[in-house]
Amino acid sequence: MWKKKIVLSFLFYLISALGISLTIQAGIGVSSFNAFNVTFATLTHLKVGTVTTAINFAFLGTCWLLDQQRKIQDYLIILVALIGFGFVINFFLYQLFGSLVFQNYLVKIVLFILGTIIAGIGTGQVVALGVLQFPIEKFCTLISERTRYSFQFYRYLVDIFCVSLALGLSIGYHSPIFVREGTVISLFLLVGRESGGNSVFYEYKSRNWNPNERISVFFK
């Protein structure tokens, strides 16, 4: 059963990465965390998946330092999943979708919504299985446990920081701005927040959320 959960968790982790790739490919802006990733990747000429993995590594390392109940096995599994996560984003963005250009704005909207839904469902399944965690959400959980502020408070702070940094870099270096209408759309599509996903699922999980309800609460 444990091995099956690990395999399924990896699968849905990668499905989430596929969804994120679609939102980026749509070209109408991305969620807060991904806005920073794409902006930084554009400025440094690195691949988006590589940047996403590197930043998640940084959060995971911080979690390791904060987590008093850390288990090497759990962190190694997340580490491997993050590598696959970045690889899938790079594969879809630069190989499978690399030559695709969408001119029709309605098509872009549909593609973005589809990607957001896929990413959210993948994330919800990962959290429901309870094997893998997403570094940013884990970081916010660990911080909230040590302070009087809630998980949501810190998750919003991360979002605000990412958006502010993305805008600052774009304006300062005169590069494309990725905080656009897609960023707003993502907030209305998901109940709560996403990071290429996702804190809402942690909130429900922490309240003994029934996994069978995950689809019904995913949409507003």
Question: Which residues fall in each region the model found?
Answer:
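Core subunits and conserved enzymes of cellular information-processing
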Residues: M1-K220
